[in-house]
Design a protein with these regions (language model features):
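Intrinsic disorder/low-complexity polar-acidic segments
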Residues: 184-421
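Feature for intrinsically disordered/low-complexity regulatory segments and propeptides
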Residues: 1-193
Length: 421
């Protein structure tokens, strides 16, 4: 791990994931700070020898004097000069150091959003790291702080003058990645491993499909092959259903603590999304509480899905193309639907899917469901990942619609014009 904003790691081994998140946790700290006690050091010049800052703090705000000039030397050996990539990131991207007490912190360029939230400011300009922005931010912190001390601010707004700063340390340097409200509760990311091991005891052997970690987002997808064997023995479906769990979290306010039930058909690479559980980073919680909440929220997917597929095996479909189009349109695959995927992609998706359907053959609802569930696999690629994510949810919902409602020779809903019948 390093402190650069663009640091990331990925893999498919659970033990490697555990090592990465434990290293991340060991370097991560949460500290409560008062906003008007911050010192914002805004970069205004730099050369090969120095980085120059203007300092904005409560003293400067109260006196209305010109900001003090500080400098960071780049010639003598130091924690900074031993990592020039971080210095270059400071000069060219974040352009801000924060001092609090006796400590100095680098800042992530992603911190702009949080600084704006703390000052109750919005708009695009908050993301432009300039002296003018930093000066105005500090003035907001000071005005609000003065209102708190004079007791002219409501208790709710006063509570927002405290922030929980999440920072990481490495090689003698510290860098702030997030500033959250005072109610924020830091939850170590290694808790994901503890929850996964809990479900290993519940569902059997764990197979880690893939994981990804960066400073702002963590994701891991695991499956349970033994549970797949149990489902196969119980329901005797033509295709193997492999259940899994997708965990996502962030300690920088970019994602809630989320767990989504997944299922994958046979040897396909893409999963379909089922029920999900999510909680904000507030309050106190332990692994057992999280695991119990996940069980209550997502376990139903593992019985509801195979039961639905069993029922669809007894449903005969006379008009497979019209049925597929009607189901997907109702589920949200519409050019003018906010839940849809757009006119161009919608047409291509339906054209591609219906290309696999032979009107001369006999189809059951199960066959149609398998075609629908193949959609994310058909278009899975990095440049269309957002589309894959949409279809994972859309297709998972689609198979629970009434298939016979759409098994008609005529187009549904005023005419489906995305492909010829």
């Amino acid at each position: 791990m390093n402190l650069l904003d663009n640091w990331s790691e990925r893999g498919s081994d659970l033990s490697e994931f555990e090592a990465v998140v434990k290293e991340l946790d060991a370097s991560t700290h949460a500290r409560k700070m008062k906003l008007d006690d911050l010192k914002l050091l805004s970069v205004f010049d730099a050369d090969k020898d120095y980085v120059l800052f203007h300092t904005y703090d409560r003293e400067q705000w109260q006196s209305k004097c010109a900001p003090k000039v500080s400098r960071l030397g780049l010639t003598a050996p130091s924690a900074f000069t031993s990592n020039m990539d971080l210095v270059n990131e400071l000069i060219n991207r974040s352009k801000l150091l924060i001092n609090y007490g006796r400590n100095s912190y680098l800042t992530s360029s992603h911190l702009s959003r949080d600084l704006g939230d703390c000052a109750r400011l919005g708009g695009d300009s908050i993301y432009n790291p300039t002296e003018e922005r930093d000066r105005y931010l500090m003035s907001c912190f000071c005005v609000n702080g003065a209102a708190v001390r004079s007791k002219s601010m409501t208790k709710y707004l006063a509570s927002k003058q405290d922030c929980v700063t999440v920072y990481r340390t490495k090689d003698g340097l510290a860098k702030i990645f997030s500033m959250a409200g005072g109610a924020y509760a830091y939850l170590p990311q290694s808790s994901l491993v503890d929850v996964i091991k809990y479900f290993e005891g519940e569902l059997g052997e764990v197979d880690c499909r893939q994981w990804y970690v960066d400073h702002f987002f963590t994701q891991i997808w695991v499956e349970f092959p033994k549970k797949a064997e149990d489902i196969a023995a119980t329901y005797k479906l033509p295709d193997i259903i492999v259940p899994g769990l997708l965990f996502e979290t962030s300690d920088t306010r970019d994602c809630s603590y989320t767990c989504t039930a997944t299922y994958r058909i046979g040897t396909r690479k893409c999963y379909i999304a089922g029920d999900s559980y999510s909680r904000k980073h507030i309050g106190t919680v332990n692994v057992e509480q999280i695991a119990d909440s996940i069980k209550k929220k997502v376990y139903a997917t593992y019985t509801r899905l195979p039961e639905r597929l069993c029922a669809l095996m007894t449903v005969d479909i006379d008009n497979p193309r019209e049925t597929v189009c009607g189901i997907l349109e109702k589920a949200g695959l519409k050019a003018n639907s906010p839940r849809g995927v757009g006119k161009i992609y919608g047409k291509k998706i339906l054209d591609d899917l219906c290309g696999f359907i032979n009107p001369a053959e006999t189809y059951t609802g199960y066959d149609i469901a398998m075609q629908i569930l193949s959609l994310p696999e058909m278009i899975s690629s990095d440049e269309k990942q957002y589309l894959v994510e949409t279809l994972r949810v859309l297709c998972g919902n689609a198979i629970f619609l009434d298939f016979k409602e759409f098994d008609k020779a005529e187009p549904v809903g005023g005419g489906i014009t995305l492909l010829p019948v």
